[in-house]
């Protein structure tokens, strides 16, 4: 394994590309996620079947109140689906200064089973994908579905994919047989929030300068002058509609300040 320490201010995507260039595996499925390295443990960011917690070793953080340094291990961080201690007990108390990852140097576990990665690799005529091939596929998918925040205001995926009890999913599935899902455990199922939002008719809709992106229903966008309250109002309308139509509650993935 390779133990790699990255400073918090490093651009995340550039860091991922650097690890691939060194033939270090584990982060390639999270290519092109906007932001810096230091923010990744806060959200336990993830994409296409991979999360930060899969390769995370520890992070150093400065206590805001005392300027003392503290090291958080993986166990300390209480990672969950887009969750960590930094969103709850330790919220607004620390500034992460660096993050340590444990990456593979050989016998990489290439993960192409999630989302559209295998389809994209097939389109590119790749049969035995490398780390770089997976990264390129993820980049192509994200660029085709997600708007560039520099060109169209957005915060990426606005909602988490809900994880629901199997019985609850089966009730919703009986009414909507085409509803996709991913098995999380014997008792829980993950449902794509983007599918629910699109099925409810929100994809591509615009409410003044706030709206839902035409290519990816998980992304709320600001067409220019929408206020935070207007974006929030659209998100709550979506949540209420999904709950009413499918009996499934979807939570915001973003942090609302």
Where in this protein do the model-derived segments appear?
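Generic structural marker for isolated residues within well-ordered, non-membrane alpha-helices
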Residues: 16, 193, 239
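Anion-binding (especially nucleotide phosphate/pyrophosphate-binding) glycine-rich loop
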Residues: 1-66
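Beta-rich strand-turn-strand
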Residues: 24, 228-231
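Transmembrane alpha-helices
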Residues: 234, 240-241, 250-252
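Phosphate/pyrophosphate- and phosphate-bearing ligand-binding catalytic cores of soluble enzymes
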Residues: 69-221, 225-229, 245-257
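Hydrophobic pocket-lining residues that define ligand/cofactor binding sites across diverse proteins
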Residues: 19, 242, 246
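Hydrophobic side chains in well-ordered alpha-helices
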Residues: 15, 231-234
């Amino acid at each position: 394994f390779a133990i790699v320490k990255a400073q918090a201010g490093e651009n995340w995507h550039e860091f991922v590309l650097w690890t691939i260039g060194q033939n270090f595996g584990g982060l390639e499925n999270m290519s092109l996620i906007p932001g810096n390295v230091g923010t990744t443990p806060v959200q336990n960011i993830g994409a296409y079947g991979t999360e930060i917690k899969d390769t995370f070793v520890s992070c150093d953080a400065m206590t805001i109140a005392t300027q003392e340094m503290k090291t958080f291990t993986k166990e300390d961080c209480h990672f969950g689906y887009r969750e960590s201690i930094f969103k709850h007990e330790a919220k607004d108390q620390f500034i992460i200064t660096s993050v340590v990852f444990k990456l593979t140097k050989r016998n990489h576990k290439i993960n192409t089973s999630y989302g559209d990665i295998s389809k994209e690799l097939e389109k590119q005529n790749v049969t035995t994908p490398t780390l770089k091939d997976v990264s390129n596929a993820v980049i192509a998918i994200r660029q085709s579905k997600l708007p560039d925040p520099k060109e169209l205001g957005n915060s990426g995926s606005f909602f988490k994919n809900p994880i629901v009890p199997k019985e609850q999913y089966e009730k919703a599935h009986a009414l909507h047989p085409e509803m996709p899902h991913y098995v999380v455990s014997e008792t829980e199922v993950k449902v794509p929030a983007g599918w629910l939002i699109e099925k409810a008719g929100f994809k591509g809709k615009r409410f003044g300068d706030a709206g839902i992106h035409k290519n990816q229903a998980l992304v709320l966008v600001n067409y220019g002058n929408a206020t935070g309250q207007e974006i929030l109002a659209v998100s709550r309308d979506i949540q209420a509609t999904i709950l009413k139509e499918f009996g499934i509650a979807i939570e915001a993935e973003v942090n609302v300040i």
